[in-house]
Structures are given as structure tokens and as C-alpha cells.
């Protein structure tokens, strides 16, 4: 459906766009301006509203105009009245009466109306001729359209007859309901054409656009003059008010000056007997300045708008500017300059803005400060100006600027001067992770739940510790899981009676000691395993001492009760001597007799562990952010830094920002002891994580932070402190410990791990290796045990950079594979002295080699040859020995060595040779030396390595 714009409709019906827009709004149409579009039906409605009303009103008026022609001026007035009566119901701008004082305007309007009346008659005749031509063209076009529509209708009837009756009925009903009949449309079109023709004829006879334009212009001029008069009255009123205010201010100042003069005179009279009375009486009147009334004379102030305004007419078109002084040329560049603004303006009547008074703020009663606050920060806190504080500090003897930091004492003195109580703010060190392990006030007491105990098995070598761990791992870990453990991460969990127990697979008590040294008391219960046939051994006593230092309960597992020589009672009595007393004897330590090899009483041992854990009341809060300890850490080629963590409090989630030791990162992936991916790790759960930027140390604490930014800041701060501490702990060499330091730095060690078939062989081999004496090197037995070489031995050897020595034993397939992967050397022997020789050779290999100089021969230069782009060639004769191609040479001149280097080339005549023998001649070139002279001596030598004994 085509649309029409409102200004097109207004042009067709001879109305203004504003009237058409208002009429469309009155009909409820959504239009905004003359450019809005409406449909054809809405356009017809708008046209009909304008055409229906004037039919009865305009005809007699048109006839009256035709029958009795009136004078031109009266005809124009009557047409204006007709237009007013027609637009009573419409919304138009009200006409304003012209001011009577402006006679020249009435004359100008009359002349304009007369001219419009003359033009009207001429335009009316031409308009009628154009309309007749247009109507004739439309009638011709309408006949063509009717013939075409008639043929189209016949074709459509033929198509409709070919379709089914149901479609015809539906089509007929739709046509009947929505669209009028074709004949009705044609008749309506003819009626609309006739109506529009009549309207145009009426409009042509009724509307005079130029007369209306003249009337509208007159109304606009009248409106402009009223606005100008109002503006002038307001300006005049503003000037009167300003003058009145100035006069009042002048009178008030004059009155105040007079009162001050009277007071001065009165004071002078009361003090006339004093010696200074005369001076006072003469000085007081001088304070009153005479008022210059000439400067206060009221002068007419003209604004910029007054320059172009006239009292008897509208605004002039700047004709007064085109004078001799306002020529636009190079000599006068200010021809279009606007009046000045600001304090230099001559006619500035705008009163200055009053200065806003600063609000008074009371001082706070307390002030919480931090060390290093600046003056500006303090000023903002106490609502004072920084300059005021700087002044106070200056009076206190402290020279400071606004951005200078102040110490705590200065801030306290400043607050005392202001009368404010100063308190230092207690700052929490975000980089301190240890506070979470020392203070548990951050935990929620009402959300504490029971957690699984963390157990460490300790004991002497060959007492069954490894066997017990293997038994627990194979029989209890992942019951019902296919494949069992798929990844060994140094810690694992077992389940007994519906409760979990976490075991730490640490390589002996050494790792436990290193953890304790870092303050990581991760163990809740210690299982001390003692062999029933051996009893208490030295390492057993050491394990007892470590457990007591960690303040953890001890459960004694007496192993190997299946052996014939087992004597559990002797073990109980020996342990009682070291402070481990059984509950049967009135002590607090539980004793369990087991056989790890045959899986005997293992259930009873686990029940005892759960009983002790229940007595200890191990609790944890899973709602807080996770903290814990690093069990193991390694650098994987594909994953990067991998750390095995034990969660002690809170719950660890994937994507948590974490700080571990002196490093930080985000938990990218997390796997449990079965090697499966998990997203959540509750308390007492061992997990392996990735996503750290560096590899942490075993035993380091970790904590989860609220966001990655805080974690990064804490990690970087901890790394900075660790580096500073390392530099501070650097021992400086003094004269007292100079030689001790040199000796300690020179001594090197060879780390070995000994595994043998029997205990006697282990002790004998360890004693023999410790007796080997090589200057500057010593043997360090990292670990010695009985049995085959297993995975734990390979792991320990990799961590300590040790060599595994197997005496009459072989490594397991898993250990051999791990040794190849970790590049750990395994030496297998069956004769003890071969072991000693091999270790001795390794110890000698640790020493730095010693070299001795050996003179090969001497020669003398007989002639020199300088070759461009090559250098100086020396012809020589061998005096003694020989000169070889790979030997070092010294150039000696007058018994002084002037150069020491290597040969670049050696020739015998024209052939390159490897050596030149005694009494032979040859030629040579020396690398980076071209200053050979005749009679220079050449000494050839080599450095030989001395065998260390």
C-alpha cells in the first residue's frame, strides 16, 4: 500500500503543513511532523475533514465575492475573516493585535495586501487554466485504466471459474469482507475526482497565499516587537536594581566609615591625657577615605544588543557598522570582534558570583594510622588542608612536603597537637601462610566435621616397614577398583570400617625430619614398627625421638611374630626404657603384634589407628579456603611443575588460586591417589595438582587465596623475602674460619645406596666404603637395607643424586624401568673388593684433574717471511727434542716470555707435517701472534694429567 507525506497532502488541498499535522493528530494518527507518512485511507480521512466542512460555508461566500465585488483592501480583510471562521475548530497560532503606536507597519501591511489582491486575480486565471488541462489529462488516463481493469477482470473471472467452489466461496467472502466492489471503487474514484475538482475550484477562489504570508509576517513582527519591549524592560529593571544595590553598598560603607571615625574620635577624647593621644586623633580620620562621587555618577549602560536596536522599529541590519572605522582590511583586524568578557569588559553588568564559604569539619576523636602515611593522606582523613599540616610540622621542627612519608612517632605527635587519639593500624601480612597453621581462630566451630587421620610408618631398616606398606597398598587400596593404583604420588588412602585412613609413603624418617624442620606437622599418628627378633635398634630410637618432637601419638607394631626367634615381651621392655610404655603397663601407647608378610593382625592394627584417631578428635572445617602441606614435587616434561599436596583444612577446588612456599599458580588439574581426575579435595585428602609456575619444595605449606591477583602478590613477596634471607645468611669468611671454610668447600661427596641379601653384608659393605680415603672426597651412605632394589630406592637415589649398589640382589622390573626413566645408575656386584675399587674410582673421578707441564723441544727462528692476508711465517731449526702440531709454544726473546699460545700451522718445506724432529728445519705460524723476529727461541710443551692416588 502506497503512502503519502503530510506536506504533499497539504500542497494538494491548499492548506499549511502545520494545519494538516494538527488535523492528523486530532484524528488519532501517529504523526510527528510534516515529513511523516500516512496510508492512502488515512490521507483520504484527512482530506475529507477539510473538504466536508467548507461545503456549506464557502459557497455563499464565493457567490458573494462573484456577485458583488468589493474593494481590494476590503476583499482581503473579508478573506482573512473567512479563514479565521474556518479554522476556529482547528489548532492554530492565535493572532496578536498590532500595536497602535506603530503606524508605519499598518501602512506597510495595507500596501502588501493591495499588492497581494492584484496578484491574486492574475494568479486565479492562470490556475484555472492549468487545472482544466490537468483534469482533462486525468480523465483520459482514467478511461484507459477503466478499459484495462475491465479486461483484467474478465481474465480473472476465467481463472476463478477453473478453481473449485470451495476456493471461490472463500475468495468471495474475503473480497466481500475486506475490499469494496470494483464498480463501487470506480464510482468512489469518480466522486473523489469531482469533489477534489470542486475543492480546488473553491480553494483557488478562497485562498490567497501571499495575503496570508503578509498577514503572518505582520504577526511575527508584532510578536518580535513585544518580545523586544519585554527584553528592554527586563534589562532596564536589572540596571535599576544594580544601581540601587551599588548605592546601598556605598551608603553602608560610608555609614560604617563615619561610625568608625566617631569611635576613633571618642577614643581620642578618653585618652587625651596620654602621650599618644595626639597621634591617635590624627591617625583615626585618615582611615576614612573621601568618597569620589564623580565615579559613582549614574551613567546609561548599553549592552551589545542595544547597539543595533532602535526604539522606533525592529533590529537594524548592522548598517551602522559599515562606516569608515569598520573596514575589513589589513589595518583593522578587529572589525568583527565581539565585546569583551570578564573584569576588563566596559559594559559588564553581571554581578560577580559570591565566594562559597568552605564548610567546617570537626576533627575526629580517633585516628588510625599506618607507618609511612603522607601529609596528603593525613589531611584527607582529618578534613584539613595539607598546607596547614605542613605548617604545624614546621612549627614542630619537622621539614616535610605534602607528598613526604611520615614515621609513626611524627604522626602521633601531630595528632597530639590536634587533640586526636592516634592508634596504629594492625596490618595483616597477606604473604604469611604460617599464620593459618598457628592460629585456628578463622575456623567456624559450628561447621567442624570429623576428618581422616594421617598416618606415617617409621622404623629401623629391615624391620618390615616397606612390607607393611606394600601389604596395606595391595590389600586395602581401591577395593573393587580395576587395576588398583595407577599412579604413585607418595600418599594414598585406605578404607576400614567405612572410615578413611591416609598413609604417607615417605622414604624413611629422613623425609619426616625434613618436614618437621620446616614446621610441617602433617602426621596425626605414627606407627613405629619393630622386629620381634631384632628388638630396638639405633634407628628405632631415632624414630622415637622424632615422633616425640612432633608430639604425635605412637602406635607400636611388633612385626615378624611368625619367626621362631620372635620375643615380643623383650621388645616391650626395651621400648619402656625409652619412654614408650604399653597401656597394659599403665602407659599411653598401643602395642599390636602383627606379621606384615603373612597379613596377620593387620585389621587389628587399623582398628587401633581408628581408635586413637577417635580419641584425638581430629576435626576440620571444609567450608574455609584450603591449606595444607606439600608431600612431593617434581618437574614433568609434559605437565610442568607437579606437586603432591595433603589438604589439612578446608576444601581444595579446581581453578583455585594457590600459593605454595615461594611460588604461586592456579590449580589447573587435580588427580587423586588412583590417578583419576577430581574437582574437589576435602580435608585429609592427598591429591596431585598442576598449574604452578615453579616447582615447590617438599614440606612447604600452601594456602588458597581469594583471587589470582592476591596470590601473585603473596607469592612474589614470599620469593623476595626468601632471597633476602638467603643473602643475609651468607656466611662471611674471617681469618678464624678461613682454612675451615676452604677445606669444607674443597671436600666432595659420593652418595651411595646399599642393598644386600643379608644384614651382615650390608654392615660390612657400608663399613668398607666409609674406610676409603681419597684426599678431598668422602663416601656418604644415604640408605642401606636388605632386599631387592625397589621403586622407593630409585626415587631416593634420584632425589639425592646417589648410585645404587646391589650386593647379591637384583632390581625389580618396575625399579629397573624407573631407573632407566630417571637416569639412575645401578651397579650389581657379588665380590666385595670390586665394589670397593669401583667406589674408589668414582671418588677419584669426583676430584678435579691435576696437570703437569712436559717440555717437548726447543727451536730457534732463523728467518721470517711476511705474507699479506696470512701473517708472519717463521723459519726455524729444532735445537733439541721435537716440535709437534698440537703442542703449545712459548716465544722467548732475551730470556723473557713474550707470548704463550698454540701453533696455527707447521710445515717441513712445503708439506704440512705433524711434527719436526731434532736438527730439522721447518716453518711455523702462531695463532694471534705476528711479531716473530730472528733469533727468537720457541719452546714446545704439553700438559699431562697426573693420576690421583
From Swiss-Prot:
Region feature (Disordered): 50-206, 220-359
Residue positions binding GTP: 459-466, 505-509, 559-562
Renumbered residue ranges of the record's region G2: 484-488
Region spans: G5: 595-597
Location(s), subcellular: Cytoplasm
Species of origin: Streptococcus uberis (strain ATCC BAA-854 / 0140J)
Major location (coarse): cytoplasm
PANTHER family found in the cross-reference section: TR-TYPE G DOMAIN-CONTAINING PROTEIN (PTHR43381:SF5), TRANSLATION INITIATION FACTOR IF-2-RELATED (PTHR43381)
Keyword list, A-Z: Cytoplasm, GTP-binding, Initiation factor, Nucleotide-binding, Protein biosynthesis
Low complexity bias spans: 187-206, 319-336
Chain spans, region G1: 459-466
GO CC field: cytosol
Positions of the tr-type G domain: 450-619
The protein's role, per its UniProt record: One of the essential components for the initiation of protein synthesis. Protects formylmethionyl-tRNA from spontaneous hydrolysis and promotes its binding to the 30S ribosomal subunits. Also involved in the hydrolysis of GTP during the formation of the 70S ribosomal complex.
Residue numbers spanned by region G4: 559-562
Full protein name: Translation initiation factor IF-2
Biased segments, Basic and acidic residues type: 52-84, 104-143, 224-275
Ranges for region G3: 505-508
